[in-house]
Structure formats: structure tokens, C-alpha cells
Amino acid sequence: MAARAPQKPLLRLRGLEASGLRIDQVSVHAGEAWGILGDTGSGLDVLSAILGGELARVRSGECLLPPDLGLVSFARQQALFEKELRQDDTDFLNRPDPGTPARDFVQNADSHTELIKLLRLEHVLDRGYRYLSSGESRKISILQELSKGLRVLVLEHPFDGLDQASCQELDQQLHLLHQKGLTLILLCSDPADLPSWCTHLALVRDGALRHSGPAGAIRPLLAESGDRTQALFQARVEDMRNKDGQTAPADASEPLVELHNGFARYGEVEVFKGLDLIIHPGDHTLITGPNGCGKSTLVQLISGDHPLCYSNDLTVFGHRRGSGETIWEIKRHLGIVSNDLHRNHRVGGSALAIVLSGLYDSIGLYHKPAAEERLLAERWLAWLGLSNKAARPFRRLSYGEQRLVLLGRGLIKKPRLLLLDEPTQGLDSANRKALLDFLERAAAEQLCTILYISHRLDEQRPFFRQHLQFSPNAAARPFRLTPSGLSV
């Protein structure tokens, strides 16, 4: 009886060198589910671009990719967002242009009702893309690829930006699709995000793909490797405390933020209403809730980046919004890191320039910085572990490195109020822990007041003094604020 010929791989990378990443050999066969782990800045984003066929300069080697391969990545989401901005007809319509309906990104949407319901997207399919939250737009990108009937699907950081329920449901759905024959490759920065049902695992570290093979043999090696991971983020509270910022010391008797009966909407779509929130100096506030409930919109109201900030009964740093104050009187006391800020950084500029721009509250650097300002920005890049990438264009950094640069931008001026909207998205577990440890020390020493949005249970640290929870059932109980005793 003749021996069976070995199964040909669907995908093979061998002897590759591209953008600082070396791949000796990895082969993916039909029906396998790969989990590939990589630290922030390790080259995981380069691997994503290779798998998506988006990297033009591959120096050598073999790159066998199937034609029916789909990719969901931060870079593709950014490209789609920028395309939507270019097509914005608001000025011609004399009304806000919501953008392409989400439904149009899904092939034969009516035949994917079960998946749409599972991802909880029924209510957003007819909404314009520009009116989607970051989590909703990520779900649409996943649905878009799943609706194509592909043989291979690559997901970069598949669970980042999704609420807890959506993470669990996506994990279950991907497992089911794998059992039905879909070949999966999941690129993750946190070992906790690697599904238990992965058949194969690999590690990207120090510019090379290592330790690839069956999950049972590789998982112990990943755990051992994770124990040795060093965070890039090395900022210390002492560094921030000893540097003079641009902001004035806080008056503990005056609320930083005071919102009464707050509301928000996009077009005709109501996001939330009836929200009361007061943040005094030291009232470090955690905000949680499902995708699309209005968490990021609340941050935009406070920062002045949502037009309805002038229609609300909202006071920020003692300024009643709409009373004649300038937005710069608000911005000068704020440090911001958010998905909205991240995707709107479309201008050219180096990592150093982006950090410096935090001193001027601008997207892009349009001032010649003083020597001491430049020195301070260089110090922040050193504390972020990115000194060697100071001159690199912001968009040529990995997504996680971009996030670290934006953290430096938000912290450089020692703000009175730090608005952090999912700041650890794209970061590995070591950098996530380092940032949270830093914030805990900053809170303890009263260097600033922190408002923090997160979907992750492991980010709910004890330094938060109040917890604003947005409910998935807004009609029954839209918000809950604890432990202050206030509720809505």
C-alpha cells in the first residue's frame, strides 16, 4: 500500500527577511489554528503585513500565500478610516455626512444574520461608518472578512477594543469556524489572548519568528519566554514629579469636571442621556461598558472634541462650556490618549515630534521647540524605550509603539487631568503592567487625576476612587456610579 503524500501547506514562509524581521521557516496547513505571540515592537506588525501581502520589500526567500486569505489589522482599519474621511461630503450636503453604511462592508449581509447577531451589530448596520465606535468598527472589519467565504483568516490583536462579552462570543465563533474548516492565524501581544483551542503556536521576538510548532510543545516555551519579557515603558513617577509642566496646580475645592443631565448623539442616533458626573482632584475614575455605549463620546465632550460639549451643562476646569472660553484653555490642562486621537494622527512627523506636540496640544508639530523642550521629549522617548526610533515617522512604528509615543505626548506636560481611553490597546502584558504601575504611583502622589476607560478586568486597579458603568440595557439603567453613592 503506497504511503500517503504529505499534505501541501496552504501558506509557507521560508528564508524571509523584511523590515527587520527574519523568518527561517513556518508552514500552515489547512484546518490548523495558529496563535502567534509577539512583544510590543518585536516585529509582529511586519508579520501581519507579510501575511496580508502588503509588504513590497521582502529581501529574500519564499512567500507562499493563498489568494483566499483575509486580514483584519489596525493598519487596514486606519486605511479604511482615512478613505472614509476623503469621501466626507459634509460641506456639500450642508449636514453631517455619516459615511458609508456599515452594511455595505459586508457581503450578502442578509445571509449572515446569525454572525451579525452574535457580534451584536444588528443596530449599527445602517449607521454610517464615521458614527461607529472604535469597537464597533473593529467588529465590522471582522464581519467583513468572515463574510467573504475565505479559507484562511489572519486576525491581528483580535480581542483588542472589544468588550468582555464580545471577546467571549468572538472566541466561541472563531472556534466554531475553525471546527468547520477555516484556517486561522491569530497575532497577539498577550499570552492570555491566545485561545486554548489553538493547534499550533509560535513566538516573534527580537526580530525573528521562533519556537513554532504544535501547541502542546510550544506553550511551555511561550510561558517561559513571557516571564523574561522586559517592558519598553520605563517612566518613573520621580521623572514626572521633578519636571515642571505647563499646567497650574489644582485647586482641590473646585471640580475638574462637572456634568449635569449630560447627553450625546450622532445625527439622529442617541448615544446616552441623563448622565451626571462630578470629578474632583484625586477622583480617579474608571469607566466601563459595552462597545458603542458612549464611553469615548464622554471623553470627547470633556476634551472639547465633540460639538455637543457646548450644548451640555458642562463645566471643565471652572469654565462653563459655551461661555466664551477657548478650547485651548481646556486643552492646556489635559493629557489625552484615545483611539480617536490615534487614528486622527494622519500628519507626517517623527516619534520625537509627536511627543513634542503634546506641549502645544496640536496634532503634528508646527512650532520650533526650545532646547529644553526637545531635551524633555528625548527623555520621555528614553523612558518609553524608544530612543533608537526618535527620528522614525510615527506611522512606520508598530501600533503598540505608536501607542507608547502617544502616552509620552499625553504625559510630557504633567496635565491636571489625564484622559486615557483604552491606552493599552496594542501593548503587550509587560508594558500594560508597567503603565498601570506608573499610574498607580502617580495617583498615590496626587500628580494628576486620571479618567480611564477599559474593557479589561486586569486593569481595574484599586487606585480608582469611582467607577462609572455604562449598562448594555440603557433603557432600564443607563449608568451606575460607585462607590460615591451616586446613581442614575
Regions inferred by a protein language model and the residue ranges of each:
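Conserved ABC ATPase signature
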Residues: 128-133, 368-369, 393-397, 401
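Conserved ABC ATPase "signature" region
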Residues: 110-125, 356, 371-389
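Catalytic Walker B motif of ABC-type/P-loop ATPase nucleotide-binding domains
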Residues: 153-157, 418-422
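Conserved structural motif at the start of ABC-family nucleotide-binding domains
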Residues: 11, 19-23, 257, 271-274
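ABC ATPase nucleotide-binding domain signature region
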Residues: 38, 44-110, 300-363
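Hydrophobic anchor residue at the start of the ABC signature
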Residues: 141-142, 407
